[in-house]
């Protein structure tokens, strides 16, 4: 039997010698040259948990993993990011699978383009990486509703993440389709998937003791035969245990290492230790700072985890971007939605550039590798294109007539229950409510998440979680009351995920009397939404545009397109679309000040740029080589 172990630089040998005394490891450099997907031909056993060690076939194995989410990275850059992972000395890719993106409507599945899971997994195998798949159904991942599809919320009695029949029936149908794609990619079928995670951090939710056994059985019944794992933070670990499933832990600091050495052992006895999520940074929320974690602290903690005889996964190795409206939110004391960038202060930047963390971790993993690491790929070029001044304009009020007949309802309808998208409701974007009023007074109601209130076309303020009332002034003549409501992102973590319906929730009141007879417009801003606005629908940009509005301009590129960062100085809040691709939201409250624009989404020649601005338009759009993610705050 081949036995692998670690030999490291003298400064770190003391801790390893202690492990030798304890019998955990036998010192020798790791030689990974034959233990890669394309070279391991004779497969029988797969990844196993035996005593303190993982075993892959007859070899002791350490998982040195990193997380990259295919859905947050342009497909054209998957190879670049995976090669950089391999060059850092890692041997395993981990990724979530987002149900909401793969099944946007009941029974209609999308695994094309940037959602081609199979192509991503097979590319990892080609590059020499094993794969741990995290298919949920709930994934958290700072995604809208934790990756669950919003159409589940059409059921007024829905209990997400439980064995409630309405939920499990939907999971079963989704898993029927998903696992038919995943099963052939497993290790025992010649693929790179060596382990599959059961749900995600359920111990912190823990509302139904029958739920985790149900998910485990749902995976196994559909042909999942590889090692099963759970993943929990320190608060949920003891409650997230499932019989026959290996428990792993999520943490960030050296102060939490006792969870590895003591708590994990107390929970499941003699089993391999695994940090499924070592958080290399953290996500950001609108209105907050840009969270960063010092590279020396990262190296110190990673070294301590490995010295403790544990496998590790770096979450995130490369964060990428919350393109479109996929970002999630948190709502404990206050509602806070996540920014567009998922840079995460990870090992690679949002644009895939190297960081001090990358260099230090590459040295570290290189020091315990028995073979030289492959050279890191060259950096991708960036380009500060010339500023772009929009020349055409379409106010939201003028755009409404091109959207077809509005939905008419006596009472407000929340976003998820709108009769659109084949009966699946609206998942993302904005929703506009209109009704007629004949008096002034106090307007009140529950708006999720942010509603701009208009009398005719004049903005009078906002309603949100903190501001639930607003004074409506007296206006002579026919008066239309309008509320433009934005879904800023459904909560992805916490106990209140069942309550994530968006738009107007319940009645809207004027002087405590419910308003009636609404006209409702679905503004999902998909590609099909903009196809209704031919060039003949736009007009020249006036000196003082009526807002909210769409602004149209063109970016001319004469050479091969490169990555760039879009800067919107003078603009306040909205969304940017390039050649039909939704780059995501911008907001001048920060911390994020630039939007990442991948080169593959541009073309040589003319590129169409559309900005939807809610409140204040700037003079131009600027492009820079350098991202600006906001004022730094060190994670403690």
UniProtKB/Swiss-Prot annotation:
**Which terms are listed as keywords in the entry?**
Glycosidase, Hydrolase, Secreted, Signal
Name the catalytic site residues.
201 (proton donor), 277 (nucleophile)
Task: Supply the InterPro entries for this chain.
Answer: B-gal_1-like, BetaGal1-like_ABD1, BetaGal_gal-bd, Galactose-bd-like_sf, Gly_Hdrlase_35_cat, Glyco_hydro_35_CS, Glycoside_Hdrlase_35, Glycoside_hydrolase_SF
Q: What EC number(s) would the UniProt record show?
A: 3.2.1.-
A GO cellular component entry from the record:
extracellular region
Where is this chain's protein located in or outside the cell? Secreted
Tell me where the signal peptide lies: 1-32
Main location as per UniProt: secreted
Q: Which domain of life is it from?
A: Eukaryota
Q: What GO terms describe the biological role, i.e. biological process, of this protein? A: galactose catabolic process
UniProt GO molecular function = beta-galactosidase activity
Q: What class of enzyme is it?
A: hydrolase
Its family? Belongs to the glycosyl hydrolase 35 family.
Please identify the protein, giving its name as recorded: Beta-galactosidase-1-like protein 2
The gene it comes from is GLB1L2
